[in-house]
Amino acid sequence: MENFYNETEPTEPRGGVDPLRVVTAAEDVPAPVGGVSVRALTGCVLCALIVSTLLGNTLVCAAVIKFRHLRSKVTNAFVVSLAVSDLFVAVLVMPWRAVSEVAGVWLFGRFCDTWVAFDIMCSTASILNLCVISMDRYWAISNPFRYERRMTRRFAFLMIAVAWTLSVLISFIPVQLNWHRADNNSSAHEQGDCNASLNRTYAISSSLISFYIPVLIMVGTYTRIFRIAQTQIRRISSLERAAGQRAQNQSHRASTHDESALKTSFKRETKVLKTLSVIMGVFVFCWLPFFVLNCVVPFCDVDKVGEPPCVSDTTFNIFVWFGWANSSLNPVIYAFNADFRKAFTTILGCSKFCSSSAVQAVDFSNELVSYHHDTTLQKEPVPGPGAHRLVAPLPQNRGDAGPNFDKVSVVSDDSRADRNLLLPAILQCDCEAEISLDMVPFGSSGPADSFLIPGQIQDLGDL
């Protein structure tokens, strides 16, 4: 999204030059900033950013189109919508501005107004899709059974339609009606410039819809997700300690087991916090500087001749590209999970370089994120006194037509059914064996003494 302003300082006539001479349009066009080498380097960096954005988001769309089990998951509709909005950023927004950055002038004439509308629409759609994903994950985690009943394809498409409709309403209508400008000068693009000074009303209102309200929603949902995960991690830890105490009658051995369980619980909580910090940190780092300037610049006094602008064009453009760079990072954060990675390796034909059980730590296609540790060490299940009353895990959701690679999920605070624990972790891009924490049965009132922890308990190790 872009908010441009341009202030040209008057030039004093030099000796021997008629001060009343006619200035041609070509002389009005600002010269490119920096030398040839600087502009060449800028072009290479921007080209690499555009290509990476195109490849990453195209892979996401291709994977969903090609593999039926990815299409069968309703939550992947939000990931695809995000990928489409980021593809539009890479096709409709980035290239035109990159050419202008290298050339130093706007070369596309009256396409300027349409480009500004595309810029606002695509950037807003990308951010609103991120907000929709956070809301979807919170609903799935806070009340998983109600979520499974209510999150139909129709409802998912309705949420996506609302996000795109808002994006179109705050972009094309104001821009085409010229409501967004602080002045009525619409001929800037005819002079080799595509800078539009946003008026204060539009700058504030569009920033609220495009960024500030969505970021508040995301902070709230991810904070709540962390608290839910933290509660369930501690509940699982108490179950592990109870099972260990039943199996180990010697007091000193039980004490050692308790200490180890507490350390494991702390490491799991740390991994949850790190993952959610990466999700929010990348988004805020990319977009916050731009939207701060977007609201500050319209209040700058740029009418005083001879005074420098409060924010330089170079600084503003850098932060604009930081925001667009978020579109190249979204596929890595939101689509690099077990399901998508298997699809990517198949599409790219590089499955022989990765084990078939290779997984990623962050999973937004099923629950929120899935935890898979980076070691092959496993602990054998510890039989306790209640082993003869072993409770079998609940079957997985039959509604998923494809293979389910996610072994861990989240339980709500008030849920009375046995569910899997979701333990997110930091993104891992190496080919690693999959180790998971199988289902641990418990009730809403806490661990039951007669329950045995079935399956294998993963050894988290040091981060």
From Swiss-Prot:
Regions crossing the membrane: 40-65, 77-103, 113-135, 155-180, 199-223, 274-301, 316-337
Xref: PROSITE patterns: G_PROTEIN_RECEP_F1_1 (PS00237), G_PROTEIN_RECEP_F1_2 (PS50262)
Topology, Extracellular side: 1-39, 104-112, 181-198, 302-315
Annotated glycan sites: 6
BP GO annotations: adenylate cyclase-activating adrenergic receptor signaling pathway; positive regulation of MAPK cascade
Span of the signal peptide: none
Keywords: Cell membrane, Disulfide bond, G-protein coupled receptor, Glycoprotein, Membrane, Receptor, Transducer, Transmembrane, Transmembrane helix
Pfam families: 7tm_1
Keyword Transmembrane on entry: yes
Membrane topology, record value: Multi-pass membrane protein
MF term (GO), any: G protein-coupled receptor activity
Disulphide bridges, residue numbers: 112-194
Residue spans, topological domain Cytoplasmic: 66-76, 136-154, 224-273, 338-463
UniProt GO cellular component terms: plasma membrane
InterPro entries associated with the record: Dopamine_rcpt, GPCR_Rhodpsn, GPCR_Rhodpsn_7TM
Subcellular location: Cell membrane
Function field: Receptor for dopamine.
Family under the similarity heading: Belongs to the G-protein coupled receptor 1 family.
Protein name, per record: D(5)-like dopamine receptor
